[in-house]
């Protein structure tokens, strides 16, 4: 009888791709994959440790699933990813329930590693220098719906922002070759994928370390040639890497969603300098103005950090006013997390947790109002929407996402009239909206 494996993946989509590679390797090695942890002989927790909240979620999940070794059939608990890569010594002591720790360099060896545990009583650790990069020859068992997929175009990061632990956990930038990416993309489309979301720590850095230094716009142009692919979405595009050529291909290529995720993190120059960000306030303002002028219909998402060391009330007011002025369509806000080993952790003028939370609430309150306002502008317009199934609230409504909404992080569209199948891309007339969601009816073609 095949042993059953269950996987819980935490954190970002980049982590999800790593989890899918491990599942693919295990399925190829004759393990049976199950989504029910109670049925699993082996449970794997793929962790995140980017910020404090992510670490807490990872630890809580590990402790919860450790109970399956007592009240379920679980024989092995395996913890993979960023948390063991960063805290291997501490975790080995504090989590004796865990049988195997695997860092970010050994995902393709997961089946071999589990086999090495047979007959070995002591806890095992496999933590190597982070040099892994996904290759299209590795199996990948996609866990997301067939119609959508993430395409991880690079691993690691060489930006060295002062608050970030990613370079120490994932290593320096390592881009996947163009032909490698195109091969995987074609395979995804051949198995039903209609939307590909490009991801990396910084997608604009893709190609800098490859022979000939190919650019992101070259990659997008080649992806757009794939027959059957309908949407290409760009996530995690650092502002200093966005070129006129990239703006032009978003503007002119029909398959590229009029959507761009640009994590600016702040707008005040003193804060940006302490963050070791390469963009300045004038440069960010000019970039956003240029994008909006060239592509008026584009949906812009950004990420911001509040409470960074030394952030004054004046810095925060500058940020708040900029958000009100710019009116981003989507906004993610994070309270600064003091991460040991980063330059920012040792900075003076650390901001209190109370002030961080207060600034977070103020910013999100403003964004809710702005998002509602921008959504109202879409009423009586038509949008392309990918159908994702029935609404969570009622099976009388279908739900989906427009090309202006990324999976998992943005709002949804609720479909009140018309028929469609999951994965269909339909035209929808927007009839109403809320702070973050849209409501509409399918337009018969």
Curated annotation (Swiss-Prot):
GO biological process entries: tRNA modification
Entry keyword set: 4Fe-4S, Cytoplasm, Iron, Iron-sulfur, Metal-binding, S-adenosyl-L-methionine, Transferase
EC main group: transferase
Co-factor requirement: [4Fe-4S] cluster
KW Iron (keyword) present: yes
InterPro entries: Elp3/MiaA/NifB-like_rSAM (IPR006638), Methylthiotransferase (IPR005839), Methylthiotransferase_CS (IPR020612), Methylthiotransferase_N (IPR013848), Methylthiotransferase_N_sf (IPR038135), NA-bd_OB-fold (IPR012340), Ribosomal_uS12_MeSTrfase_RimO (IPR005840), rSAM (IPR007197)
Record domain TRAM: where: 376-444
PANTHER family, A to Z: RIBOSOMAL PROTEIN S12 METHYLTHIOTRANSFERASE RIMO, RIBOSOMAL PROTEIN US12 METHYLTHIOTRANSFERASE RIMO
Name of this chain's protein: Ribosomal protein uS12 methylthiotransferase RimO
Organism: Geobacter metallireducens (strain ATCC 53774 / DSM 7210 / GS-15)
């Amino acid at each position: 009888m095949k042993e059953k494996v269950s996987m819980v993946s935490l954190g970002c989509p980049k982590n999800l791709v790593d989890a899918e590679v491990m599942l693919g390797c295990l399925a190829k090695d004759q393990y049976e994959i199950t989504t029910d942890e109670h049925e699993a002989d082996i449970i794997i927790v793929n962790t995140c440790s980017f910020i404090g909240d992510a670490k807490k979620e990872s630890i809580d999940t590990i402790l919860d699933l450790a109970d399956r070794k007592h009240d379920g059939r679980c024989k092995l608990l395996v913890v993979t990813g960023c948390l063991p890569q960063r805290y291997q010594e501490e975790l080995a002591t504090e989590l004796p329930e865990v049988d195997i720790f695997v860092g970010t360099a050994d995902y393709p060896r997961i089946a071999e590693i589990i086999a090495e545990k047979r007959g070995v009583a002591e806890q095992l650790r496999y933590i190597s220098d982070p040099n892994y990069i996904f290759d299209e020859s590795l199996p990948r068992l996609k866990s997301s719906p067939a119609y959508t997929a993430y395409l991880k175009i690079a691993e690691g990061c060489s930006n060295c922002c002062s608050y970030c632990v990613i370079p120490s956990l994932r290593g320096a930038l390592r881009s996947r070759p163009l032909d490698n990416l195109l091969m995987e993309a074609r395979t995804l489309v051949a198995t039903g994928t209609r939307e590909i979301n490009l991801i990396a720590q910084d997608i604009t850095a893709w190609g800098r370390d490859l022979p000939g230094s190919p650019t992101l716009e070259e990659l997008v142009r080649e992806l757009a040639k794939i027959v059957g692919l309908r949407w290409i979405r760009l996530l995690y595009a650092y502002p200093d890497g966005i070129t006129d050529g990239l703006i032009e291909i978003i503007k002119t290529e029909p398959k590229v969603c009029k959507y761009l995720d640009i994590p600016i993190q702040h707008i005040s120059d003193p804060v940006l300098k302490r963050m070791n960000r390469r963009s300045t306030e004038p440069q960010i303002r000019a970039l956003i103005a240029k994008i909006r002028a060239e592509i008026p219909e584009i949906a812009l998402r950004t990420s911001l950090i509040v409470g960074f060391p030394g952030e004054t009330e004046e810095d925060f007011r500058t940020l708040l006013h900029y958000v009100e002025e710019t009116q981003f369509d989507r906004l993610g806000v994070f309270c600064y997390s003091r991460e040991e080993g980063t330059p920012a952790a040792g900075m003076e003028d650390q901001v209190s947790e109370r002030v961080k939370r207060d600034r977070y609430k103020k910013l999100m309150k403003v964004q809710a109002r702005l998002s509602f306002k921008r959504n109202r502008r879409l009423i009586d317009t038509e949008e392309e929407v990918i159908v994702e199934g029935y609404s969570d609230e009622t099976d009388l409504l279908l739900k989906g996402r427009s090309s202006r909404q990324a999976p998992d992080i943005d709002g949804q569209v609720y479909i009140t009239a018309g028929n469609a199948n999951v994965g269909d891309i339909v035209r929808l007339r927007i009839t109403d909206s809320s702070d973050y969601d849209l409501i509409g009816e399918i337009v018969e073609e």
